[in-house]
Regions:
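Generic N-terminal leader/processing signal
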Residues: 1, 5, 14-20, 26-28, ...
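The feature encodes a structural signal of leucine-rich repeats
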Residues: 37-39, 55-59, 75-80, 95-100, ...
């Protein structure tokens, strides 16, 4: 398909979106064909939907006020200091790491990103963080905090959690067989889910004693 035809398709689809997103079609076209991008275009006020776009990287200085959808995009790296005001969707990504200074105001969804090995110390996850089935993940940063829920289910190579881990919502550790204990100072603002894991060897009281001076606000599901 000719480049002109692809651009016309982008432009046509963009006309059907809300006015606040009207410049994003041009940005998507430039990203797809690796064209130069202005500073103004790097500041996206609304959502930026790049789902399925065959790109491997994003430009430095990109800021998205709404959601950034990169599912099925073949993305291999993200720029340092990337800021997303809404959700950052990276389901089934090929990312091996995340950049320093990444800030996500909504949900950071990395479900099934099986090449991801670690998270940066400077990551700010203000909403939910979905790391379910990130099978290469081996650790979390010391003093890590998640504003919402944290899903670590099916993270088979995760063998420990850092002391002082804070989770604003519920914590899922279903079938994370590598975990044989929980750290001191763990705080969970919601419930704890340990179904089909080695943590079911401990009683509820033993788990709550194990994490002191930490605390689990909700129930423990086993």
């Amino acid at each position: 398909m000719k480049k002109e035809t692809l651009k016309n398709i982008f432009d046509f689809l963009e006309e059907k979106e809300n006015k606040k997103h009207k410049d994003n079609g041009s940005l998507k076209w430039k990203l797809f064909f690796n064209k130069s991008i202005t500073k103004e275009e790097l500041n996206v006020n609304g959502d930026l939907n790049l789902r399925g776009l065959k790109i491997k990287s994003l430009p430095e200085g990109l800021k998205v006020g709404g959601n950034l959808d990169l599912k099925e995009s073949e993305i291999q790296s993200l720029p340092e200091g990337l800021k997303v005001g809404g959700d950052l969707i990276l389901i089934d990504s090929k990312l091996k790491s995340l950049p320093e200074g990444l800030k996500v105001g909504g949900e950071l969804d990395l479900y099934w990103s099986r090449e991801l090995t670690s998270l940066p110390k400077t990551l700010k996850a203000e909403g939910d963080l979905n790391l379910g089935t990130c099978t290469s993940l081996t650790s979390l940063p010391k003093g890590f905090k998640v504003g919402g829920r944290l899903n670590l289910s099916h993270c088979e190579n995760l063998t420990s959690l850092p002391e002082g881990l804070e989770v604003g919502g519920s914590l899922w550790l279903i079938e994370s067989w590598g975990l044989k204990s929980l750290p001191k100072g763990l705080y969970v603002g919601g419930s704890l889910h340990i179904q089909r894991s080695n943590l079911t060897n401990f009683s509820d009281d033993e788990i709550r004693d194990m994490i002191k001076p930490g605390f689990i606000e909700g129930k423990i599901y086993r």
